[in-house]
């Protein structure tokens, strides 16, 4: 494992964090009274767009080279369409899970769906960018000792931290603090965002700290 690979991973993650920061400040230049809390649904859409765009650009640059067969135009178009379908399936699946765990079924359906969209952005989009629409690869990466690169290690950490952040964000909702960020699903989306950012920061540091112990099957 080369230190340059870890540095490239760190810089990539810093750009992902920067995209979230941009989603907070840039819209305020064009949208009146824009804020994360007051116009939360708008921010969710913008943040999802920014993070997805940055992930697409970055992973196109850092993703390992594929075979000539995979570089054909028809394969790229098919792969892109599959990725879109997988992303939509992820959004609807998360939406159903949230409802089963107590989210409003009809009253706040849009809010719940956009929560599913942002969580899919933090978890499913990186998987699609790095692994493609390949469920076997996904299962391999998230199984024990299944990773083959530092990028997959990072993918594990950021995905898990996003889920943990979303779960922790739900804990304050039933409390009677009467804060504006306790309204569904603001605390959950903010928790997922902080969890995603934490994963982006922690994963390169963890990989660097354990670089001598980490071994990969393709090395």
Curated annotation (Swiss-Prot):
Alphabetized InterPro entries for the sequence: GPI_biosynthesis_protein_Pig-F
Cysteines engaged in disulfide bonds, as pairs: none
Pathway: Glycolipid biosynthesis; glycosylphosphatidylinositol-anchor biosynthesis
Transmembrane segments: 11-31, 42-62, 86-106, 113-133, 155-175, 189-209
Keywords: Disease variant, Endoplasmic reticulum, Epilepsy, GPI-anchor biosynthesis, Intellectual disability, Membrane, Transmembrane, Transmembrane helix
Gene Ontology molecular function terms on file: ethanolaminephosphotransferase activity
Keyword Amino-acid biosynthesis: no
The keyword Membrane is assigned to this record: yes
Assembly description: Part of the ethanolamine phosphate transferase 3 complex composed by PIGO and PIGF. Part of the ethanolamine phosphate transferase 2 complex with PIGG. PIGF is required to stabilize PIGG and PIGO.
Disease tied to this protein: Onychodystrophy, osteodystrophy, impaired intellectual development, and seizures syndrome: An autosomal recessive disorder characterized by global developmental delay, impaired intellectual development, seizures or tonic posturing, dysmorphic facial features, and hypoplastic terminal phalanges and nails.
Name assigned to this protein: GPI ethanolamine phosphate transferase, stabilizing subunit
Gene label: PIGF
